[in-house]
């Protein structure tokens, strides 16, 4: 969390690569994440406000601060009915569909990446953490992102069979749809 002072005052989330973690691979994934988020304009996806680099050259992005709890925790704690839970789930599906229409696969849909926050007392789910997102076609950044052969990318319990194969081949929008099914 950070305090933005210009051009307006507001609390924001600031994502910055930690010192010593700025390998080429980490920087490339970071830039892909901020590019993926910058392409989105959906009420159920956390918004990016600004991107840049510090004076020392460390890349960062400033985004909407989403305060809330995991979607599963929200549903349990508030004892939502099935129709109420499905209403939240439908909003998440629309957000993922928006990402797909923008050419982005999230690849890590899971409860901790869907935060429910309250807006005027109304629950609003927000899809967050596009850190391992992948472009459907082409690249999200000019920097090359290397995924090592048989490198594990994602959360096993929510992975599609294609994603779990570790080849990276065959991963497309169905990967996110599979994860949504597991979440449901």
Q: What residue spans do the PLM features occupy?
A:
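Conserved ATP-binding/catalytic core of the eukaryotic-like protein kinase fold
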Residues: 1-184
């Amino acid at each position: 969390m950070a305090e933005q002072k210009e051009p307006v005052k507001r609390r924001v989330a600031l994502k910055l690569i930690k010192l010593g973690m700025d390998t080429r691979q980490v920087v490339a994934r970071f830039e892909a994440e901020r590019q993926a988020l910058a392409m989105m304009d959906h009420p159920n996806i956390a918004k990016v406000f600004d991107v840049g680099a510090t004076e020392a050259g460390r890349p960062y992005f400033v985004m909407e601060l989403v305060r809330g709890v995991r979607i599963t925790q929200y549903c349990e704690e508030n004892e939502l009915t099935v129709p109420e839970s499905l209403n939240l789930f439908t909003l998440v599906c629309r957000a993922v569909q928006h990402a797909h229409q923008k050419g982005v696969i999230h690849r890590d849909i899971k409860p901790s990446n869907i935060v429910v926050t309250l807006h005027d007392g109304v629950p609003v789910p927000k899809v967050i953490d596009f850190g391992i997102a992948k472009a459907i076609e082409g690249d999200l950044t000019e920097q090359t992102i290397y995924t090592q052969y048989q490198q594990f990318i994602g959360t096993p319990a929510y992975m599609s069979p294609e994603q779990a194969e570790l080849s990276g081949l065959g991963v497309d929008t169905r990967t996110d749809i599979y994860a949504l099914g597991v979440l449901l």
